[in-house]
Structure formats: C-alpha cells, structure tokens
Amino acid sequence: MASHVECRPLGVFECELCTLTAPYSYVGQKPPNTQSMVLLEESYVMKDPFTSDKDRFLVLGSCCSLCSRLVCVGPECSLFYSKRFCLPCVRENINAFPQEIRQDLEKRKAPSKRTPSQPGSRT
C-alpha cells in the first residue's frame, strides 16, 4: 500500500514554452527509490509509465536558472549546461555560452534539408 502512496502525483508539470503537461510525483535532486542517484538540478520527476520497475523515473523539466520559467527537458525548449536554461534565455545571452553550445543551437534552428535521392521527396 505504501508504494501506491509514493506514486501519487503531487501536481501537474506544465512547460511554459511548449505547454507539455504531465503529472509529477517528485520535485528535487534525489528521486525516491534511487540508491545513489543525485540529479544535477532540482527537477520535476515522474515514475516511468513504460515499466513496472519502481526505480525507473523520467525527468520532466526544471526551472530556467536565469528567468525561473518552468521548462521541459525537450531540445526545443531548454538545454542543460551546468544549469538549466530555457532557449529564449540562451538566445538572449548566446555570447556567454561556449562555441559548442552556439553550434548546437544553430543545428537546432536549421531546417532539415532533403536531397532528391531521399525517400519521400519529389524530383
């Protein structure tokens, strides 16, 4: 019976950028039922719905370390570079990030280009 109590959602996580919503069961750096796992940031966590293993969990998101906006871990909403940053804050402060982060952000923005030889394209 105790295991049912710890799986109950505490609330609903909602990303302020993409509006992803999901029930979360824990907020912090050390999710329940983990032996030595410590997350690098205060995170909103839910039990992994794809497994019956109670030790498995999914990190939904965290607060942006600059603006405190609640954002999911999706690559279109945030990135983690020693701390969580929402992409609007990354873009506003792009020169404060290393070249590798800037290149990664450019790759995210670039539309995928199809060549005529790829399936699904018309010539």
From Swiss-Prot:
InterPro entries xrefs: CDPF1 (IPR042426), CDPF1_dom (IPR018785)
Biased composition (Polar residues): 114-123
Pfam families: C6_DPF
Region spans: Disordered: 102-123
Family membership noted in the UniProt record: Belongs to the CDPF1 family.
Name under which the protein is recorded: Cysteine-rich DPF motif domain-containing protein 1
Gene field: CDPF1
